[in-house]
Curated annotation (Swiss-Prot):
EC category name: transferase
MF terms in GO: amino acid binding; aspartate carbamoyltransferase activity
EC number(s) stated in the UniProt entry for this protein: 2.1.3.2
Function: Catalyzes the condensation of carbamoyl phosphate and aspartate to form carbamoyl aspartate and inorganic phosphate, the committed step in the de novo pyrimidine nucleotide biosynthesis pathway.
Taxonomic path: Bacteria, Bacillati, Bacillota, Clostridia, Thermoanaerobacterales
InterPro entries: Asp/Orn_carbamoyltranf_P-bd, Asp/Orn_carbamoylTrfase, Asp/Orn_carbamoylTrfase_sf, Asp_carbamoyltransf, Asp_carbamoyltransf_Asp/Orn-bd
GO biological process: one example: amino acid metabolic process
Protein name (record): Aspartate carbamoyltransferase catalytic subunit
Binding sites annotated in the UniProt record for carbamoyl phosphate: R55, T56, R105, H133, Q136, G261, P262
Length: 304
């Protein structure tokens, strides 16, 4: 049973993941129907993002409002943090304003775990450094479950900058707990050392990873990595690891294509592949709202 906070997929049991997904499907029914509920009336959700985010922050805002909660967002660029206030003081200040749930994103791994120790409010990790992005993995797993049903024996290929991807880490933790087989592929300079210890198979070309896959997941390449020399050029990355229609034909005939967004089109994924019938990238966005509604509901009810 999910406790006070959601800090990472690594901390969750298989049963906890499935509990969240089951409720997320119920929340999606609400989204597709009446849309608005008063389930969290009187509750307050606050987002504090120390890194840029449009999708995740807006998704949490919509999730809170659809459930009838009050919502607030702290703009870090104009907040007291810029004036020297510590992270812990900021979190305590927000708690004193009677926030029930605080969603935070920070470029330093482990920040949500630290903050959770200093507040009675529930902390949701909206992404911490290169460590984890649990809500993205949950919406990805929801999308896979929706399309494929069972995870046991499912073959998933994750392609891109594995080393710097918190999305990859959270997905690997979750997919392995649910019984999927995971392959990862990317340039050797973007592959973490000893990642095999997470139970994945490492491939150094896209074709090997995609062959016979049920799910193909591209990761966003941060273009600044190329400037720092971690891979030679965008063109070379696209040639060897870009997901296109030809490579997707190596996957199973009913395979699905995923991407956490935003996509660098014609770098990680071609427009042809992203717009194809097997692409579920837009459905991931809707499922993101449903998953975050489920998490807010679970954590607020635990607080009661």
């Amino acid at each position: 049973m999910l406790k006070k906070d959601l800090l990472g997929i690594k901390d969750l049991t298989r049963e906890e993941i499935l509990e969240i997904l089951d409720l997320a499907f119920e929340m999606k029914k609400l989204l597709n129907g009446e849309k608005y509920s008063q389930a969290l009336r009187g509750k307050t959700v606050v987002t504090i993002f120390f890194e840029p985010s449009t999708r995740t922050r807006l998704s949490f805002e919509m999730a809170a409002k659809y459930l009838g909660a009050h919502y607030g967002n702290i703009e870090v660029a104009t907040s007291s943090v810029v004036k020297g206030e510590s992270l812990i003081d900021t979190i305590r200040t927000v708690e004193r304003m009677k926030a029930d749930v605080i969603v935070t994103r920070h470029n330093m791994s482990g920040t949500p775990h630290l903050l959770a120790k200093y507040t009675n409010a529930s902390i949701i990790n909206g992404g911490d450094g290169i460590n984890e992005h649990p809500t993205q993995a949950l919406l990805d797993m929801m999308t896979i479950k929706e399309k494929k049903g069972d995870f046991k024996g499912l073959k998933v290929a994750i392609i891109g900058d594995i080393m710097h991807s918190r999305v990859a880490r959270s997905n690997i933790w979750g997919l392995k707990k649910l019984g999927a087989e995971v392959k990862v592929a990317g340039p050797s300079t973007l592959m973490p050392p000893q990642i095999e210890k997470m139970g994945v198979k490492v491939c150094y070309n896209a074709e090997e990873a995609i062959k016979d896959a049920d799910v193909v997941m591209g990761l966003r390449i941060q273009l600044e990595r190329q400037k720092s020399g971690l891979f030679p050029s965008i063109e070379e990355y696209r040639e060897y690891f870009g997901i296109n229609e030809e490579r997707m034909r190596l996957a199973k005939s009913d395979a699905i294509l995923m991407h956490p967004g935003p996509i660098n089109r014609n770098v990680e994924v071609t427009s042809g592949a992203a717009n194809a019938s097997y692409s579920v990238i837009e459905e991931q966005i809707t499922n993101g709202v449903a998953v975050r509604m489920a998490l807010l509901k679970i954590l607020c009810e635990r607080r009661n």
